[in-house]
């Protein structure tokens, strides 16, 4: 059983994956709030409470974090509480199997890397990956499995909250599809702007990529969505052809398997 930990700026996904390679399956997944000052002990208490008896069946762990302080605590947690479980943390120097054809590879978020890796592994074709999180990342992977770059926009909730915080007449609203693109009250107007506006933003970015990037105009390009708010926008999107709730977790699994196999089964355990 592989423990997969995906730490983002606002929320953290913890998953359990059984099997490996083509037989791998996410059997459990939890989503909890990210606390930037959380300690290794608090993390261990939370995760052990989630996975229960499966804690004794762990054969590996893989983690990423877009919050550097939390990645450090994840490392300490794995070393202290699961010292015999081999683990991989997605950070510079770790073999991911995906070349980063960008100006500064160290700047590319680990979440973007594993998403593109998982998309290419699944479809074996050029792909555009859209991750709907606190930011919306639209990333591009070539037919050779190379990360070509992408675009980043503020996420739906972040944008909606910012609008409410900076205007006395607006308030924080639930992200939901309104009755119409023409809102009849302030809440519906904000929902329409968020849902239909961001659907247009994503379709526009995908369309521009397909027009401007050589090799991305054909039918062989996989356009994959993932992320917590993706289901809200999927009915409004014209460009997305696939949705994978577990894309990031499978990307973590792929990196773990690559490093395990490269080291003949010997990955880092606590000293």
UniProtKB/Swiss-Prot annotation:
CDD domains: ASKHA_NBD_PanK-III. Its main location: cytoplasm. GO terms for cellular component: cytoplasm. It catalyses: (R)-pantothenate + ATP = (R)-4'-phosphopantothenate + ADP + H(+). Its EC number is 2.7.1.33. It is an enzyme of class 2 (transferase). The active site is at residue 111. A monovalent cation. Ammonium or potassium. Substrate binds at residues 109-112, 186. HAMAP family: Pantothen_kinase_3. Signal peptide: none annotated. It comes from the Bacteria. This is Type III pantothenate kinase. One of its GO terms (molecular function) is pantothenate kinase activity. It comes from Mycolicibacterium paratuberculosis (strain ATCC BAA-968 / K-10). Keywords: ATP-binding, Coenzyme A biosynthesis, Cytoplasm, Kinase, Metal-binding, Nucleotide-binding, Potassium, Transferase. Belongs to the type III pantothenate kinase family. Pathway: Cofactor biosynthesis; coenzyme A biosynthesis; CoA from (R)-pantothenate: step 1/5. Its cofactor is NH4(+); K(+). The lineage of its organism: Bacteria, Bacillati, Actinomycetota, Actinomycetes, Mycobacteriales. K(+) binds at residue 131. The gene is coaX. Catalyzes the phosphorylation of pantothenate (Pan), the first step in CoA biosynthesis. GO terms for biological process: coenzyme A biosynthetic process. Homodimer.
